[in-house]
Amino acid sequence: MKRVWMLNHYAQEPGRPGGTRHYSLARHLRQHGWDATIIAASVEHKTGRQRLDAGETQKVESYDGVRFLWVRTSTYSGNGFDRIRSMLQYAFNVPRAVRSTELEAPDVVIGSSVHPLAAWAGARLARRYNVPFIFEIRDLW
């Protein structure tokens, strides 16, 4: 089975407010023999809900066979400094979180440009694992 890692800071599990596009893509890929992991921030963008308990730096959960790796970021509201800090935390915590889990190495990494640092984190992982990188441009800002 081929493995794909999808990096999207704001990805959502099913049933939550916000974008579930990568979850839908992962379910579709699963029907075609791919194992997908979505790597997202621990803080839910729309509500500010923290998915991790105190002391946790990452957590793996599955929804309908789609794996999510939640990476610790801090809460924020609005578009100020705290949100930028969350973006930086995501970009720098993703490689550490991946190393701390038992995820099998990917065959391809997709970095979504929900903000440039998310895609940059994906490019770093692809380089580390020597696999192709797909830069998903979603918003040209």
Language-model features and meaning:
Residues 12, 44-46, 76, 117, ...:
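Surface-exposed, flexible loop/turn segments at secondary-structure boundaries
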Residues 1-64:
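N-terminal subdomain of nucleotide-sugar transferases
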Residues 38-101:
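A conserved catalytic-core segment of Leloir-type glycosyltransferases
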Residues 1, 33, 105-106, 130:
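A general structural motif
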